[in-house]
Amino acid sequence: MLNFSAQCMDMAQSILGGNIGAINQDGSIVPVENESSFDCEPGHAAMALGEFHRATGLTEIDGKNIVDLTAACITAQTNDKEYTEDGLAYSSLGLLAFGPSKERNLVWEKLSEETRKNLDKRLLSRSDYEDHLQIFNIAKAVARFSMGLSKKDETGKLIDKFLERIDQTSRGKYFDDKPASGIDGVFDIYGIVSFVFIRQSLQLHANMHL
């Protein structure tokens, strides 16, 4: 009997293998029948593929090239007319899963010059959020610094701001995802998601001592 870790890896490979056919060659995602696709889906797919590669070192699933598909997903997400914070943040972490710098990144090598420029521009975009959306700024800052697109690392400052908001909105140090709503706070799964996402970003940061 496989240990729990191996079972989880087998399950992940099975799920990815069952869904990888939904990724088109241009990086767009085919929606499930009778459903509509979301603008952020290519970015989510890029991160799923990147994490599988990071965990296994594999570059193929069921004969499909993970590197090429991730590059296609990132290209689709980056060049999409509809800008989505989460799609870009997820695709950024998917990119970093293939290497901590652009000199050693299999996917970066596949991106066109136009996509690289658009990615740099969109990673620089910032909105000051009061809720869980702030974690996407953290991921974008990690990607921008790690890929050498900026010499200034804003990661620490953005994490501090995220934690300051928790202090401001909850005396119990709980993550309130709707602080502007008055006394009715929202303490749901997004609090856990936020800390997991930040941890993921720091794991992929070029500066492992941050």
Predicted segments, located by residue:
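Low-complexity, Ser/Thr/Pro/Gly-enriched N-terminal "stalk/linker" regions
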Residues: 1-51, 63-65
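Aromatic-lined, polymer-binding surfaces characteristic
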Residues: 34-56, 62-210
